[in-house]
Amino acid sequence: AIAMRLAVTQPDLVRGLVIARPAWSILAAPANMRPNAEVGELLSSMRPEAARQAFAASGTAQRLAAESPDNLASLMGFFSREPSVVTAALLASISRDGPGVDADQLRRIAVPTLVIATGMDLVHPLTMAGELSRLIPHTRLTEITPKGVDRKAYVAEFRDALDDFLKGRCSSPGACTR
């Protein structure tokens, strides 16, 4: 979201744009950010261990365990982050936030753009990446192996996609699509 905003507000500073696992497109407080908000709400109303247990028993955690285990692992990590009051406020703020750009502004981005995304990621959905790749001209959408499937492949494919983009190997349509 920050990189998109910079590309829109300070285009003279941007030669290329990389958007990795986007959680926002143009709307603030998208539904995919709700799990972060839930964790923040629990941390603001309970002690961290009780909040962790409540979240682990929730429908959200069960869905994440089945569909997006890496997201669940990340969210569970917030319960041990100190100070918990700051973590709660940060999660609430991030969940309500947005990129502060609209579709017309994204359509005016005039630099090569790489969007990297994975399946099995409910907080950073592949559909969000697809939406951004349709809105921003000169975009290559690269889908890589989800961390929850194979972390080593995820890291290697992420690195390769970024390397290809930065070396200018993504100049033709589909060149960076796996």
Residue ranges and their predicted role:
Residues 119-121, 146-147:
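Acidic beta-to-alpha connecting loop that harbors the catalytic carboxylate
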